[in-house]
Structure formats: C-alpha cells, structure tokens
Amino acid sequence: METIAKHLDACQEQLLELYEENSNELKKHIQHWKCLRYESVLLHKARQMGLSHIGLQVVPPLTVSQAKGHEAIEMQMTLETLLESEFGMEPWTLQDTSREMWLTPPKRCFKKQGQTVEVKYDCNTDNRMDYVSWTYIYVFDTDKWTKVKGMVDYKGLYYIHGNLKTYYLEFEKEAKKYGETLQWEVCIGSTVICSPASVSSTVQEVSIAGPASYSTTTSTQASTAVSCSASEECVQAPPCKRQRGPSRPIGNPQNTQSIVCVTDYDTLDSANNNINVNHYNNNKGRDNSYCAATPIVQLQGDSNCLKCFRYRLHEKYKDLFLLASSTWHWTAPNNSQKHALVTLTYVNEQQRQDFLKTVKIPPTITHKLGFMSLQLL
C-alpha cells in the first residue's frame, strides 16, 4: 500500500504542476494524459488489492478505473498522431485537448475558437437556444489530420471535408424538441436568417471567419458574409448584448434551510483567476438573512484538476479552510456545462482572505466568493 501511495502522490503532484503551468504545447498535454493513464492503473491495482482508500483518495470500482484508463489511452494516442501532423506545432490549450471537448459535437474531432449561434424556435425570443459553431475543426481521415472551417446555414451547423458536407447539429431536430411550428430564426452576431416555410436546398452557408468577425460586421459586410436564396429572407439585427445580472436563485428559499449565495457580477481578468466581485460588504443595508455568516469559495474547473488541487489543499493548507466538498455538478435538462465544482467553507471572512492571499489557484480553475447557511450540516 505504501508503494502505491507514493507513486500516486508523485503522479498527482505532476498533474497539478501541469495544470498550474497551463502550457500551450501539445507535448505537455500528451504528458497530462499519460499521467491520468498511470493514475488509473494505480487505482485499479489498489482496488484489486482490496483497498477502498489511499489516504484521502477514494479508490473507485474496477470498472470505473478501467474505463478511465481506456479513455486516457485513447486521448494519448490520438494526440500523439496530432503532434506528428502539420498542426502539432499550433498552440493547444488544456481545454482544447480535454475529453469533454473531444466528445463535444462534432464528436471525435478537435475544435478551436467557438462562436455562439442563437436559434429562436417558433421565432419567439423567449424560446431560444445557444449553440457553438467552431471556427476550425480538425478531422482525422484514414491516416492524416485535415483542418476545415465550421459553417452555419438555416439547416444547422456543419463542415465540409473533401466533397462531403457533414451536419453535426440539425436545427429541425432541435425544433421538434423545443418548438411547435418547426420554424426558427438563426442569429449569428448581427445577422439574422429568418425562417422560411420549408427548408430550401439552395440555402447558402455562413463561414465562421474569426472570433470577432460578427461583432464588427457592418451592413455592407454582412451582405457578403451571408448569401440568401429566394426562399430565405435575411435582415440585419442590432448587435446582441450579453445578459448580465445575478444568477438564478438556487431552489426555493421558503422550502430549504441550506442556501448558497454566490455572487455573479462583474468578472475580473484571468490574471486574477476570474474572481467574481462580491458586493456583500458594499450593501450592508440589504437583507442577508439567507446568507448567514459562513463564507465560501466555489471552485470551478476540470474534475480531475479540482481533485488534485483539493488533495494539495488538504496536504499543505488544511489550516486555511474549514471544509472541502467532493466534486459536484449542476444538473438541468439544458445544461451543457462540463465543468465540475468544489465548495470550500471558512470559519470567517478573515480566514478566507488569508486563504486567497496564501494559496495559488491554478489558472485552469476559476473561483467565486459567496456565503452559505450550514443549518443542514
């Protein structure tokens, strides 16, 4: 057991170093998946030996560690082929090479520079969904990687590889789930493709040219970016503004005694780890009866990254916080977020301030400040 524990500690320490480095080199991300593969092997062996815990680390069932190991092998081998291609020297982030991104439509392709496409079903602004169209999609065919551009038309999101047009999201299928009239509008930046009575085969595509291309498109430029058929009407809409304001309330305050109050106001830049500014102390006159006195920090990021970071907190900074939760996720029918969450609690705000001043949070983990009622704990 001691040998496995030492190897597991070294493996997780290397993982955390890779997360903190936040490299743009593909070979570093290959090393990341090698570490995850080795971690799965160690946990699998520990379970075979009858161990349920290694220190604070819970040993998963054999089927879980085996599945995780297979996933790590797949990602490692795939990235190794990408490294050998002409795209291996491009900048790649940890998010670009994550398992979640690999399985995001179009599945088993790498993607970069996502652009938001808003679709209004039944042409109703209250019945809209956001989708991601990728500027660049990396497709593996037979023995080589090909880089293609993501496209948008009235029918859906697609890319063209060779002479094959592949839709990875069709709006008609989505309209059957979310709409009633099988009509919809596609909003791309400042351009709106209005819904015709039926989908015409002459609908022309919109190419996602770059991260800021839509926000700066003028009326003249938009007319060349979107080509409309006779059955399709194109109009210019004002630039969409991002909705801002408090996040949705968690549960019903009248029916629960455990309330999490996490602020969701102006977000600072990445140099400050995306801290969301907490206006609690600037609004002392308001009612905070549901946010009784227990300060929290809510961490968000990759599940494995959070587990390694939590392990380091228990090892080196256990006096700077009170409790640390297990990793958890928000569940909702339309929630596409893949990030995990960990909640840390503190004795008082001073301890939380000491924690934030002392502990270096990896750039791949964002955090928010808030308060929690612990009446149920």
Swiss-Prot record:
GO biological process assignments: DNA replication; DNA-templated transcription; regulation of DNA replication; viral DNA genome replication
PTM statement from Swiss-Prot or TrEMBL: Phosphorylated.
Transactivation domain: annotated segments: 1-200
HAMAP family hit by this protein: PPV_E2
Biological role: Plays a role in the initiation of viral DNA replication. A dimer of E2 interacts with a dimer of E1 in order to improve specificity of E1 DNA binding activity. Once the complex recognizes and binds DNA at specific sites, the E2 dimer is removed from DNA. E2 also regulates viral transcription through binding to the E2RE response element (5'-ACCNNNNNNGGT-3') present in multiple copies in the regulatory regions of the viral genome. Activates or represses transcription depending on E2RE's position with regards to proximal promoter elements including the TATA-box.
Subunit field text: Binds DNA as homodimer. Interacts with protein E1; this interaction greatly increases E1 DNA-binding activity. Interacts with protein L1; this interaction enhances E2-dependent replication and transcription activation. Interacts with protein L2; this interaction inhibits E2 transcriptional activity but not DNA replication function E2. Interacts with protein E7; this interaction inhibits E7 oncogenic activity. Interacts with host TAF1; this interaction modulates E2-dependent transcriptional regulation. Interacts with host BRD4; this interaction mediates E2 transcriptional activation function.
The protein's name in its UniProt record: Regulatory protein E2
Naturally occurring in which organism (per UniProt): Human papillomavirus 13
